[in-house]
Structure formats: C-alpha cells, structure tokens
Amino acid sequence: MTESAAPWRRVLAYWWYAWGLSWCYWGIRWANQSYFRSGIRSFDRAIRLWPQFSRGFYRRGLIRGRELNDHAAGIADMDRAIALAPEWPDPYLQRGLFQRFHGDQRAALADLRRYLALAHDPTWRAEAERQIAMIQAELGEEEVGTLER
C-alpha cells in the first residue's frame, strides 16, 4: 500500500473505510442493498481522500461485484487494488472468482494461480484449487469440442 497521502488524509480515509464496512455489515444483516450503496459511497470518500488506498478499492469492488451484481465495476476495482498492491493475494482471488462466473475463464485461471503463488490461507487456497480444477475441466471439454468440429 502506497503511503503518498498526508497522514491526516490516511486517518480520515480509514475512518470512511470503517464507516463503509459498518454499512455493509447492516446490508448483510438485513439483506438490504441500500446499505451496500451507502457503504460504496463511504468507500468512494475514502478513495477520494487517499487515491492509493488499495483496501478501499478492494472492498468497494467486493461489494459491487458480489452484493450489487455489478461485476464489471467489481473487476475494475480489483484491477486498481492489484495495481496498487501487486503482492496482496486477496484481490487476485476475488477478481478470479468474478471472472470465473461472469467473464473470462482463462483470465480467472491466471488470477487464481497468482493467488495460490502469493497466499498462505489454507481455507481459501483450497477453494482456489477447486475452482482451478473446475476451470481446467471446462476448458478441456471446450477444446475437445472444438477439435471434433
């Protein structure tokens, strides 16, 4: 995470980030998308205060892609989080999952493999490995189908 913003801006950005997390908690608790949209606005404020705040982009992308079904925006936010913190594994996992279910299987495969190269969390590693195996099986079937034509 780049520390280029003034300390007071980073503190205020973390405050807005925490406020956004609280909105998202209530969105999950009450299954109400308006809370998620309020969380997004809080993450937007955090990012405006500290444009290099990779966690702000990550969390905003997670909520956009997973809770608000705006997968393209979620992937774009993960792209930005990765650009800011390329050795942080979590955005690779989430972007890979978004791509897996809403986009490009080959890009998903690359992201999930990158996640495995960086991550140490056994729970999510197992999920990434499972998704990779399923993508490889699906791509293998597609390639066999293409060759038969």
Residue spans for each PLM region:
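Register position in tetratricopeptide repeats
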Residues: 25, 32, 66-67, 101, ...
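Helix-start (N-cap) detector for alpha-helical repeat units in TPR-like alpha-solenoids
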Residues: 13, 54-55, 89-90, 123
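Structural signature of tandem alpha-helical TPR/SEL1-like repeats
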Residues: 30-42, 68-80, 102-114, 125
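Conserved structural position within tetratricopeptide repeats
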Residues: 45-48, 79-84, 117
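Alpha-helical segment of the N-proximal tetratricopeptide repeat
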Residues: 11-45
